[in-house]
């Protein structure tokens, strides 16, 4: 079964009211997404979605005629294009979806996984006051969620600490993860990053509160700073959601000594790369646990990878209602991915990633 064509479709989904993401200085009034369709010569299709795919024609030229089952070669070709251009990993993910459909197997099983569900942590997106965050966390707990991730974005962490402390005190049933949002910046955002001393002081406060992990308290490339944090504090340190290469992820594990490395399969390394990084993490007694904030398809791809590779008890699920509801997150999908009453989440049953786009339903949002 050979690859015959690669098609892309662009969409823009309006966000009204706007989403006030903690990591973005500008309100988000829409979300753009690209769906890639990889077709084989027998008519089987595979789908994935993420950011724009400006290299579609180049990838199509390099991949047409390739054996779709030779996913390592597909991965290698995407990697060579990624080096020179943008993040093209949704093509590799779509090929895995195609293979799953051809073999009538879910992707997590193709990847060697043996389970179909995993505990979810609800990943918040907005900055809100302590009372509102406690209210939202209590509602999530009552719905079965076992863990939440809280965002902050203040230069002075003391501004945000009362929110974290309130959740730990008033919703003690939840594991709490904290994202400092210092790893990277949005285009044009020149806000200074924390230094190692600031991050260490904050880490000690979170350790006192029993926080599960501290995520991205330093710039992603500050390997010496991460190593000092890892060796100087007792809390798990997580990083690497936006790395470009496997080498960067590997360096965070080895030189940076982070406990959790977080490359997103649709942004860095695809599913083959995730497996390699996860195995390295396991050998070092650490874990790979993916970032999943793109869209519903991105969450789905990372969920399949987590089922196969992750040794973390949780997987990230973007969910912060009413600002970021499951319906808002999954507008691109024909189904909504729900967290069960026992706190677990699964892909939809079926082959490949488990869903195929309903192009008629989302045609109203198409822009290209």
Task: Label each residue range with its predicted role.
Residues 2-15, 24-27, 33, 41, ...:
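Flexible C-terminal active-site loop/helix
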Residues 3, 43, 59, 91, ...:
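Conserved, mostly hydrophobic/aromatic
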Residues 5-7, 38-103:
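Metal- or metallocofactor-binding catalytic centers and their adjacent structured scaffolds
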Residues 50, 122-125, 150-152, 178-182, ...:
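A cross-domain feature marking catalytic cores of carbohydrate-active enzymes
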Residues 66, 70-73, 219-238, 243-344:
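Shared catalytic-loop signature of beta/alpha-barrel
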Residues 92-127:
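Glycine-rich, aromatic-flanked loop segments that form ligand/cofactor-binding clefts
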Residues 117-233:
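Metal-dependent enolase-superfamily TIM-barrel catalytic cores that perform enediolate-based chemistry
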């Amino acid at each position: 079964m050979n690859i015959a064509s690669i098609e892309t479709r662009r969409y823009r989904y309006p966000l009204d009211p706007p989403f006030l993401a903690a990591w973005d200085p500008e309100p988000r009034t829409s979300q753009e997404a690209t769906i890639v369709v990889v077709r084989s010569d027998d008519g089987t299709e595979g789908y994935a979605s993420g950011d724009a795919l400006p290299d579609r024609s180049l990838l199509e030229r390099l991949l047409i005629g390739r054996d779709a089952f030779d996913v390592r070669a597909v991965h290698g070709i995407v990697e060579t294009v990624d080096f020179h251009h943008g993040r093209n990993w949704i093509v590799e993910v779509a090929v895995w979806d195609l293979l799953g459909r051809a073999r009538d197997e879910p992707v997590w099983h193709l990847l060697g996984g043996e389970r179909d569900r995993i505990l979810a942590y609800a990943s918040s997106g907005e900055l809100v006051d302590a009372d509102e965050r406690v209210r939202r966390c209590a509602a999530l707990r009552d719905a079965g969620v076992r863990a939440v991730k809280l965002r902050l974005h203040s230069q002075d962490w003391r501004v945000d600490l009362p929110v974290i402390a309130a959740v730990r005190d008033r919703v003690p049933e939840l594991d709490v993860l904290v994202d400092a949002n210092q790893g990277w910046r949005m285009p044009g955002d020149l806000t200074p990053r924390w230094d190692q001393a600031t991050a260490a002081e904050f880490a000690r406060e979170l350790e006192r509160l029993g926080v599960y992990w501290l995520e991205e308290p330093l710039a992603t490339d500050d390997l010496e700073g991460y190593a000092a944090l890892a060796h100087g504090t007792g809390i798990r340190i997580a990083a690497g959601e936006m790395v470009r290469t496997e080498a960067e992820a590997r360096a965070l594990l080895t030189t940076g000594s982070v406990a959790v490395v977080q490359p997103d399969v649709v942004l860095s390394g695809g599913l083959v790369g995730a497996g390699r990084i996860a195995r390295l993490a396991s050998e070092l007694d650490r874990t790979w646990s993916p970032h999943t904030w793109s869209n519903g398809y991105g969450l789905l791809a990372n969920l399949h990878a987590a089922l196969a590779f992750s040794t973390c008890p949780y997987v990230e699920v973007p969910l912060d209602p009413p600002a970021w509801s499951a319906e808002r997150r999954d507008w691109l999908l024909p189904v909504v991915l729900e967290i069960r009453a026992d706190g677990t989440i699964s892909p939809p049953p079926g082959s490949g990633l488990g869903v195929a786009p309903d192009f008629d339903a989302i045609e109203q949002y198409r822009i290209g």
